[in-house]
């Protein structure tokens, strides 16, 4: 790909990245960052696999942000990787989602390095945002 195209795409997705980062999510952009984070993972971590698709913009990101900020119980850490943009980081994070098909957008709640709750695209696309938020907050209540 051309450098101009890559720069265009970086600028295009910047607001999509910032929506989660500004809400306190730590963005992991390289496989090394994912490895370093996961090596020390203790407690609970809520992971959002971000995406450029419409259901990420209209449902996944807003539901994740509102669930984290509005829940009485919540994870110890919130992180995000960006599918289709930070491919190596996303692939490395998905290695921890053993038994789950790659899906973007998607969300996972981990205890240590083990997935205890997973929300694939199929449980995001076509749903009401309140349903997605409830799915997330129910997982927080059960596991955090």
Swiss-Prot record:
Question: In which domain of life is the source organism classified?
Answer: Bacteria
Q: Which GO terms describe its biological process?
A: cell redox homeostasis
> Which Pfam family, just one, is annotated for this protein?
Disulph_isomer
Family per record:
Belongs to the bacilliredoxin family.
Protein's recorded name:
Bacilliredoxin BLi02323/BL05224
Tell me the organism.
Bacillus licheniformis (strain ATCC 14580 / DSM 13 / JCM 2505 / CCUG 7422 / NBRC 12200 / NCIMB 9375 / NCTC 10341 / NRRL NRS-1264 / Gibson 46)
């Amino acid at each position: 790909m051309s450098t101009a195209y890559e720069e265009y795409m970086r600028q295009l997705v910047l607001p999509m990245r910032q929506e989660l980062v500004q809400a306190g999510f730590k963005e992991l952009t390289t496989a090394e960052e994912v490895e370093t984070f996961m090596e020390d993972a203790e407690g609970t971590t809520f992971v959002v696999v971000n995406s450029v698709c419409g259901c990420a913009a209209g449902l996944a990101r807003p539901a994740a942000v509102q669930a984290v900020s509005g829940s009485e119980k919540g994870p110890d850490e919130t992180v995000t990787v960006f599918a289709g943009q930070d491919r190596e980081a996303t692939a490395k994070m998905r290695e921890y989602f053993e038994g789950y098909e790659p899906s973007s957008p998607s969300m996972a709640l981990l205890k240590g390095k083990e997935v205890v709750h997973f929300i694939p695209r199929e449980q995001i696309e076509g749903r009401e945002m309140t349903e997605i938020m409830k799915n997330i907050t129910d997982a927080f209540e059960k596991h955090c």
